[in-house]
Amino acid sequence: MFLIEADGKRVLYTGDFRLHGVRGKVMDKILDRRIGKVDVVVTEGTTVSRSEHKAVTEWELQKRVKAYLRQYKYVFVLCATTNLDRIFALARAVPRGKYCICDEYQKTLVKVVSDHWSSLSTFYEMPKLNTPGSCILQGFQERGGLMFVRVNRQFERIIRQFDPQQSILLYSMWDGYRTKPDSNIPEFLSLTGTWAELHTSGHASPNDLRHVIEKAAPEIVIPMHTDAPQKMQTLCQNRKVILLKDREELLL
């Protein structure tokens, strides 16, 4: 989120956000202590056209992975490298004595986040991550554990080394990537004997959108990143909702 202050006006630009992530509980503190009342909220509205339902939290995904690690010796997770909160959460699901593996690029990103944020939250303390060298893969073969994978030939070769009957591949991304025409993800998911979805939305639910708007108490709400901007009015009936077109300007 960005709080923009200029010429006596205060504008809150939310970007994509959600309250069911690992840090969702601190949102009220941020709104109360750091933001307060604003004149305008420019907010994402990805979910306003969807039916309301309780969003699965990142902590619930972590619990599912713990269960999969008890059921399967080898758990492979396909998720976005930039979804670092999920990588931190799932890495912490791996029990002592088992391996947690990712490639060098993913490990570097995790370390950058840990270096900057671990002093503010223990959640971001550096987890024990290994990169897939021959000795590590031998240990993974013997003890099992969790491996973050990407759709490429390197990980395809690695996955084929392990018994598919003792393996599961968890698809932890937006399903549209998998179902789009000519996607190579279905073929990748077939490398193990079993695959399952393990994902939750990266966007705020309608109730969470309403909650943040009411907290910020703006006079004007401007929806963006939505296929149904007109539905924003039903979420905040006591606010003025302005629907802007691309390149259209609004003077406050």
Model feature map: region roles:
Residues 1-85, 89:
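His/Asp/Glu-rich metal-coordinating catalytic cores
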Residues 9, 17-19, 47-48, 82-83, ...:
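Short, glycine-/Ser/Thr-/acidic-enriched flexible segments
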Residues 10-11, 39-40, 74-75, 97-100, ...:
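Beta-sheet entry/capping signal
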Residues 13, 42-43, 77, 100-103, ...:
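General beta-strand structural signal in soluble alpha/beta enzymes
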Residues 30-34, 94, 236:
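Active-site catalytic pocket residues across diverse enzymes, especially alpha/beta-hydrolases
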Residues 33-37, 119-126, 193-195:
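Structural recognition of alpha->loop->beta junctions
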Residues 50-163, 224:
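Hard-cation-handling environments
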Residues 95-96, 127-252:
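C-terminal regulatory/interaction regions
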